[in-house]
UniProtKB/Swiss-Prot annotation:
Organism: Streptococcus pyogenes serotype M18 (strain MGAS8232)
Residues holding (6S)-5,6,7,8-tetrahydrofolate: 121, 125-127, 355-357
Site feature (Plays an important role in substrate specificity) residues: 229
NCBIfam families cross-referenced by the UniProt entry: PRK00011.1
Modification type N6-(pyridoxal phosphate)lysine: residues: 230
Catalysed reactions, semicolon-separated: (6R)-5,10-methylene-5,6,7,8-tetrahydrofolate + glycine + H2O = (6S)-5,6,7,8-tetrahydrofolate + L-serine
Protein's UniProt keywords contain Amino-acid biosynthesis: yes
Pfam families: SHMT (PF00464)
Coarse class of the protein's main subcellular location: cytoplasm
Keywords from the UniProt entry: Amino-acid biosynthesis, Cytoplasm, One-carbon metabolism, Pyridoxal phosphate, Transferase
Protein function: Catalyzes the reversible interconversion of serine and glycine with tetrahydrofolate (THF) serving as the one-carbon carrier. This reaction serves as the major source of one-carbon groups required for the biosynthesis of purines, thymidylate, methionine, and other important biomolecules. Also exhibits THF-independent aldolase activity toward beta-hydroxyamino acids, producing glycine and aldehydes, via a retro-aldol mechanism.
Subcellular location: Cytoplasm
Recorded metabolic or biological pathway in which this protein acts: One-carbon metabolism; tetrahydrofolate interconversion; Amino-acid biosynthesis; glycine biosynthesis; glycine from L-serine: step 1/1
Protein's name according to its UniProt entry: Serine hydroxymethyltransferase
């Protein structure tokens, strides 16, 4: 019987080898991709539970199928914990991803072809904020706002003037590569001034918001969307919040049956675990440590005139660095750092002049190393290792030194092999 084949290593050695190799990679590489984090064993256990067997179209208490009394408890736990964590009146935990959450929010708020003002991808926005290759840009008329050319920060007066000019039905705030705190109250004032809805995509900063170390968009936005991984340190998935009952009904209808069929109740269970972890007072210490580590790492780059720190600093979990004084582009930097077991990604910088496949910058985030227990000292060391590798990118002896120093760090802060 299929139930006898419970050991992946014995049943599917080829797959197991790939999984094991990834486990070793995570254990021995320094993870600096800003959208990645390391979940607890409890989150993984919930996601790998028997809940994966259950189909449950609909919502708790109103399902299409029978036998849903147990998953109703699971999903209700996730909903109530999300509401408590973020101080929201309503929560939808069924969205499979942040992109699905954004799609549902758009469906609830606007019609195809409506004008939307969102952060330009090159300035730090996300694909789902109007990129022409994405469903958002294909379905709606997105107009992008950027950052100030001098400060590389959001200029709210300029955004207001742009909103007056284009008269959007919706304004989207939030980013995937913006290192500064966002003033959601100002964004709501801009939206109110032009009669637009305000939607905030807090995917990257959700954990910081939950911990109270970053301003919350929930009191100001008509709808807030998020992923449940990144700084929130949960499973890969989506979340939608609102304080408006009428919008909550539209959101639920947009998610199911509008965009999705059956929810992934095993993932929702993992979300519930992550929300409970984030409700623990210790999570605030973790989130503050992310900010402290990121600031410490960014400061090392700021003090080296061979690199340019975008916007001059960071207020959250991420920062961007222009690397073109020491290496041709961000792609080469990313590939080189992969070779010394430091993982990050190339990233466009504001007013980028290179191809998005090359870029002038790299993006660095500290959520994952903070989950391993690394602190300010280690963050500074990692920054120096990155600089050492990039500056000496043609010197294999020095690159090998960096590899050994990376291994010493990861051995000192084990991930799942404690």
């Amino acid at each position: 019987m299929i139930f006898d084949k419970g050991n992946v290593e014995d049943f599917d050695k080829e797959l197991w080898d790939a999984i094991h190799a990834e486990e070793e990679r995570q254990e021995h590489h320094i993870e600096l991709i800003a959208s990645e984090n390391m979940v607890s064993k409890a989150v993984m256990a919930a996601q790998g539970s028997v809940l994966t067997n259950k189909y449950a179209e609909g919502y708790p208490g109103n399902r299409y199928y029978g036998g849903t009394e147990c998953v109703d408890i699971v999903e209700t736990l996730a909903i109530e914990r999300a509401k408590k964590l973020f101080g929201a009146a309503f929560a939808n935990v069924q969205a499979h991803s942040g992109s699905q959450a954004n799609a549902a929010a758009y469906m609830a708020l606007i019609e195809a072809g409506d004008t939307v003002l969102g952060m330009d991808l090159a300035a730090g926005g996300h694909l789902t904020h109007g990129s022409p290759v994405n469903f958002s840009g294909k379905t709606y008329h997105f107009v992008g706002y950027s950052v100030d050319a001098d400060t590389e920060m959001l200029n709210y007066e300029a955004i207001l003037e742009q909103a007056k000019a284009v008269q959007p039905k919706l304004i989207v705030a939030g980013a995937s590569a913006y290192s500064r705190s966002i003033d959601f109250e100002k964004f709501r004032a801009i939206a109110d001034h032009v009669g637009a809805y305000l939607m905030v995509d807090m995917a990257h900063i959700a954990g910081l918001v939950a911990a109270g170390v970053h301003p919350s968009p929930v009191p100001y936005a008509h709808i807030v969307t998020s992923t449940t991984h990144k700084t929130l340190r949960g499973p890969r998935g989506g979340l939608i919040l609102t304080n408006d009952e009428a919008l909550a009904k539209k959101i639920n209808s947009a998610v199911f049956p509008g965009l999705q069929g059956g929810p992934l109740e095993h993932v929702i269970a993992a979300k519930a675990v992550a929300f409970k972890e984030a409700l623990d007072p210790a999570f605030k210490d973790y989130a503050q440590a992310i900010i402290d580590n990121t600031a410490a790492m960014a400061a090392v780059f700021a003090q080296d005139d061979r690199f340019r720190l975008i916007s001059g600093g960071t207020d959250n979990h991420v920062f961007l660095v222009d690397v073109t004084k020491v290496i041709a582009n961000g792609k080469l930097a990313q590939n080189l750092l992969d070779e010394v077991n430091i993982t990050l990604n190339k990233n466009a910088i504001p007013f980028e002049t290179l191809s998005p496949f090359k870029t002038s910058g790299i993006r660095i985030g500290c959520a994952a190393i903070t989950s391993r227990g690394m602190g300010v000292k280690e963050s500074q060391t990692i920054a120096r290792l990155i600089i050492k590798a990039l500056v000496n990118h043609n010197q294999e002896t020095i690159l090998e030194e960096v590899r050994q120093e990376v291994r010493q760090l990861t051995d000192a802060f084990p991930l799942y092999k404690k």
